[in-house]
A protein has these predicted regions:
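Generic structural signal for short, solvent-exposed loop/turn connectors between secondary structure elements
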Residues: 1, 24, 42-62, 101-105, ...
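C-terminal or mid-to-C-terminal helical accessory/interaction module adjacent to the motor/catalytic core
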Residues: 139-164
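Conserved RecA-like P-loop NTPase helicase motor core
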Residues: 37, 49-139, 147
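Short amphipathic alpha-helical segments and helix-helix/interface helices
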Residues: 14-18, 41, 64, 113, ...
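Short, polar/charged, Gly/Pro-enriched helix-capping and turn/loop motifs at alpha-helix termini
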Residues: 27, 123-126, 154, 158
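Conserved helicase/translocase motor-coupling segment
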Residues: 1-46
Length: 164
């Protein structure tokens, strides 16, 4: 059910991506399922790059560098592969937007939220957690909110700001 809900939402990711690109932004889209990521990349009209778990280190480094240099304005990431140790914040003056499919893992979500929002970024970032209301994702969003609030409480309230 989760995979189907995420796959059904791919056209929304595409529409938001195209709108963001038309407004002069770069986009990072985070997915939980490879099928959704591939469908997204097949539907978007702009060139894109990807960060996935089974890619070679050289490919990953090149894809990150191309996105950071704004050679490519769209980066599609598997949320588990695009979390730790990845900086995709604005270094060139092109604002970043992240579109995030919800996951049960608060840690993965927190990591995804940190990819484009960094000290030293040249422009503000915007981040959207997109879930399909009335589906299993509503439950996921509620569970995620509880987990993120627990993390927030443990860290003295300084990590998540207005998303809660």
């Amino acid at each position: 059910a989760r995979q189907e809900a995420e796959l059904m939402r791919v056209p929304v990711f595409v529409e938001l991506t195209e709108q963001a690109i038309a407004e002069g932004n770069a986009v990072v889209a985070f997915f939980n399922f490879r099928q959704s990521l591939e469908a997204y990349r097949n539907l978007i009209r702009e060139e894109s790059t990807e960060i996935i778990g089974d890619q070679k280190d050289d490919d990953r480094v090149r894809n990150i560098a191309d996105f950071q240099a704004n050679k490519v304005k769209i980066c599609a990431c598997m949320i588990q592969a695009g979390g730790v140790g990845l900086s995709l914040h604005d270094l060139q003056g092109v604002p970043r937007i992240s579109l995030i499919a919800p996951t049960y893992s608060a840690i993965d979500t927190k990591q995804a939220l940190g990819r484009i929002h960094r000290a030293g970024a040249l422009s503000p970032s915007r981040q959207y957690l997109l879930f399909a209301n009335g589906t299993v994702e509503t439950q996921i969003a509620r569970s995620l909110r509880r987990k993120l609030r627990n993390i927030e409480a443990l860290s003295d309230g300084d990590t998540l700001g207005a998303i809660l």
